[in-house]
């Protein structure tokens, strides 16, 4: 086995861990450089890496890989074309492609988690990536709702002055709101005002509860069974 092939195997075996790190970079780095044109480009580069690496994570399934590859080109294109100085319809397209692409990735992650027989480090990272991507997917939905209706959400305090000016800034605010809703924290600084926004927010809150009740419960049950089997094998026969 060559060094190159060995490195590829290591990357593939830790593909969900790498995706998790990239997602955290996309979420946590941009707010510290708000308003910077350079940071806007850096964010687009990081987000493109997330899109590309998300494709790499589904390489184990040919059908999903083919669909994701077909969707990747319009998703990356819309990411770079949509901007504060561009037409609003490009922001709609950008969010729509993100919804479809991340929806497919979430489908693969859910299938991977529910078909696994052992709880490994990568399975845990896959579960965390699944959770984060659900929030990003819903953030794109919320952004399109606000762009379409104009007043789908009510913003309190300083957010009221900042939100809704540019599609990119709006998406960042909606990522925050999406995580707050998915985790059912509900700070109250962003309030869904339109019926469509309320329904989508309620759906996300329910999915957040289902995630804990179903996904996490399954992983815990598999892990418990593994430990019981290991204990039974380690116990010497009478």
Feature map (PLM): residue ranges:
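Short, hydrophobic transmembrane alpha-helix segments
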Residues: 28-40, 54-62, 84-85
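Pore domain of cation channels
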Residues: 168-230
């Amino acid at each position: 086995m060559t060094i190159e092939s060995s490195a590829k195997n290591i990357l593939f075996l830790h593909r969900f861990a790498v995706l998790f790190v990239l997602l955290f970079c996309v979420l946590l780095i941009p707010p510290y450089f708000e308003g910077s044109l350079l940071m806007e480009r850096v964010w687009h580069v990081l987000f493109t890496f997330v899109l590309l690496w998300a494709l790499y994570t589904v390489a184990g399934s040919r059908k999903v890989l083919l669909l994701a590859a077909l969707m990747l080109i319009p998703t990356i294109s819309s990411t770079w074309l949509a901007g504060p100085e561009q037409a609003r319809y490009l922001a709609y397209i950008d969010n729509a492609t993100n919804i479809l692409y991340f929806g497919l990735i979430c489908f693969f992650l859910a299938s991977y988690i529910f078909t696994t027989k052992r709880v490994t480090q990568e399975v845990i990272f896959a579960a965390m990536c699944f959770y984060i991507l659900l929030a990003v997917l819903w953030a794109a939905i919320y952004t399109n709702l606000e762009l379409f209706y104009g007043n789908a959400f009510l913003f309190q305090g300083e957010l009221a002055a900042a939100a809704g000016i540019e599609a990119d800034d709006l998406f960042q605010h909606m990522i925050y709101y999406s995580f707050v809703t998915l985790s059912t924290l509900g700070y109250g600084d962003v309030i869904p005002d339109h019926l469509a926004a309320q329904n989508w927010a309620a759906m996300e809150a329910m999915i957040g509860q289902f995630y804990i009740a179903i996904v996490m419960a399954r992983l815990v049950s598999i892990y418990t069974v593994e430990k019981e089997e290991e204990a039974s094998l380690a116990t010497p026969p009478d």
